[in-house]
Amino acid sequence: MSHELLRQPKWRVIDQSHFGPLFDAKQSFAIDDALCTAVGAGQSDAVVRTWVHENTVVLGAADTKLPYIDEAISFLRQEGYRVVVRNSGGLAVVLDSGVLNISLIFPETKNTIAIEQGYEAMYALMAAMLASYGARVEAGEIVGSYCPGSYDLSIGGKKFAGISQRRVRGGVAVQIYLCVNGSGAARAELIRRFYELGRQGEKTKFAYPDVVPTVMASLSELLGCELSIDELLVALWRTLQSFGGELYSSALENGEWNWYEQYWARIVERNETALKGELLAGE
């Protein structure tokens, strides 16, 4: 399986997988928006960014409309998790030291990239990356998972990853979270309790997922071997190279930091608004 979007002449690699507990998920959303702007303006090659955040639950805008959201968020914080509202769609997901996030950032200046194309590119990359482990990766909604979607990635019917997209100023960010190690069911149980406390049996206009923890697992659980974030990083870079592109390491540059500051201010304001300000006192 391959995809033309993966055949970039150069890939700019930005690895932020070892920044530690002070690295806030809000920073990642602002960084991806800044990189989308740079790539869309033709000031950067295509980007592959890898990132890890410790003990964070990222909510979608719809999650903040739960009738008992205050109690649900208090529960997450008591369990030791930061709570962040993302700047795009989707629903609640768990990030921790065993979850690898990957962003592929493409320019949309010459040719329009259909939404389906973005998803298919990430699916193709993951299928190729995991083929060496003997895994057959499938794409399709896994009912009972958290943040369900038509591009849930699964092995043997158990979800280990979810894909999303964001488009900013001519740049397209295709993002995936990969549950590399740890318990997929334990992560799902956390989100099941979040929705249980957030709804408390009330009917809601939005159809929140009824999470079934047993339909989710980590790659380590599914493949029967203990995988590390670093091992998956090497597999990712080797797989990208196999599509013919040159990879080089990089960090954000001066102009990108200026854009980052703007997007950071927006995401902070969004979180203060979505979480009604006083909820942030727990962070």
UniProtKB/Swiss-Prot annotation:
Start and end residues of each BPL/LPL catalytic domain: 42-248
One Pfam entry name: LplA-B_cat
Domain of life: Bacteria
EC number assigned by the record: 2.3.1.204
Pathway: Protein modification; protein lipoylation via endogenous pathway; protein N(6)-(lipoyl)lysine from octanoyl-[acyl-carrier-protein]
InterPro entries for this protein: aa-tRNA-synth_II/BPL/LPL (IPR045864), BPL_LPL_catalytic (IPR004143), LipL (IPR024897), Octanoyltrans_LipM/LipL (IPR050664)
Site feature: Lowers pKa of active site Cys: 159
Catalytic activity, as annotated: N(6)-octanoyl-L-lysyl-[glycine-cleavage complex H protein] + L-lysyl-[lipoyl-carrier protein] = N(6)-octanoyl-L-lysyl-[lipoyl-carrier protein] + L-lysyl-[glycine-cleavage complex H protein]
Function: Catalyzes the amidotransfer (transamidation) of the octanoyl moiety from octanoyl-GcvH to the lipoyl domain of the E2 subunit of lipoate-dependent enzymes.
The protein, known as: Octanoyl-[GcvH]:protein N-octanoyltransferase
Annotated source species: Geobacillus kaustophilus (strain HTA426)
